[in-house]
Amino acid sequence: MTPEEYLEGQVLLIDKPLKWSSFQAVNKLKYLLINKVGLPKKFKIGHAGTLDPLATGLLLICTGKFTKKISELQGQAKEYTGTFYIGATTPSYDLETEIDQTFPTEHINEVLIHETVKQFLGEIDQKPPIFSAIKKDGVRLYEHARAGESIEIESRKTTIHEFEITRIALPEIDFRVVCSKGTYIRSLAYDFGKAMNSGSHLTVLRRTKIGDYDVKNAIDITLFEESLQ
């Protein structure tokens, strides 16, 4: 692809590696496009929806004039697959922090799991995790969390379009979810465990779709770099 084509606008489908932040992925591509393709240092580039470092999968990175499409792309429904670990919670609702509480699981069976799924379909109220980048009083929630401060987090409306359990091997449950913008799958994991009178946290998360864009058509950053050689 020519520099002009990148400047005119592209949506790059990247399969984000584990432990990379979305910001790191954008910076890596920016570096490659400046140094390997010859784009000007101030060209526009940005992503259309953050993925946590502990998640993998589809990251849409827009270049040039297509950065104007970012807000439109962010509004698209998103599909995720992953794993809940039942019987324990963590402060971050995922593996970023250590287990802080354990809960009974003897009462949990397939019937209860599938009945609980129904509670989360459609529009729901969801509280974001305190380990998140949302701001409260001008300060990001994770900064309050790391300072050990307790803070009241307001719930927000979000929509779960589809929610299915794809494997049950307790204490693990695999799932597939299609949801609206602003949905936290970590919060879904936490709330799901609570709804079963137990606890749960997210151990695996992969974003597979954003609107019509599919991770099957995405490229690994290393392969993208090699394609520019």
Curated annotation (Swiss-Prot):
InterPro entries: PsdUridine_synth_cat_dom_sf, PsdUridine_synth_N, tRNA_psdUridine_synth_TruB. It comes from the Bacteria. The keyword Translocase does not apply. The active site is at 52 (nucleophile). It catalyses: uridine(55) in tRNA = pseudouridine(55) in tRNA. GO terms for molecular function: RNA binding; tRNA pseudouridine(55) synthase activity. Its EC number is 5.4.99.25. It is an enzyme of class 5 (isomerase). Keywords: Isomerase, tRNA processing. The keyword tRNA processing applies. GO terms for biological process: mRNA pseudouridine synthesis; tRNA pseudouridine synthesis. Belongs to the pseudouridine synthase TruB family. Type 1 subfamily. Responsible for synthesis of pseudouridine from uracil-55 in the psi GC loop of transfer RNAs. This is tRNA pseudouridine synthase B.
